[in-house]
């Protein structure tokens, strides 16, 4: 989707709210680093609505998380969520792929997986670099955070986001292998 339609704006609002609130919940694995199932929201909404929606859901949703949590807005990590959402939405650019219509093939899934993994790595490295250069955070702390966040996001993407997105696409297929018995 390239046009900013009412449907897309509503999807961005719902996605950002879900990502923002669910982002408050997670399992600690390193200093200020959590496994957050909310990343699955970015995966699904990016695949459904495209890179612009994924980007905005990540940016707005992470800002909501940081604001509600009260620890201040960490812009490097906010931008990294936007980058991840954008990467997840790139699958929409593949002709023939549609979660809504249940159309995809193995190449689409491979593309989605690779784009998602590369997006996660780029985003987390960006956030860590931003924290060191702009925020003045100690290098050794950021290395632990970057490694932890990368592992956490990859796990959530592969275990929740990808299977949920594929499951939605499968459930939206227009044809089945069911046969009417006579």
From Swiss-Prot:
It is a multi-pass membrane protein. Its main location: membrane. The chain crosses the membrane at residues 9-29, 40-60, 71-91, 114-134, 142-162. GO terms for cellular component: plasma membrane. InterPro entries: ECF_substrate-spec-like, UPF0397. The keyword Cell membrane applies. Keywords: Cell membrane, Membrane, Transmembrane, Transmembrane helix. It is found in: Cell membrane. Belongs to the UPF0397 family. NCBIfam families: PRK13661.1 (NF010182). This is UPF0397 protein BcerKBAB4_2500.
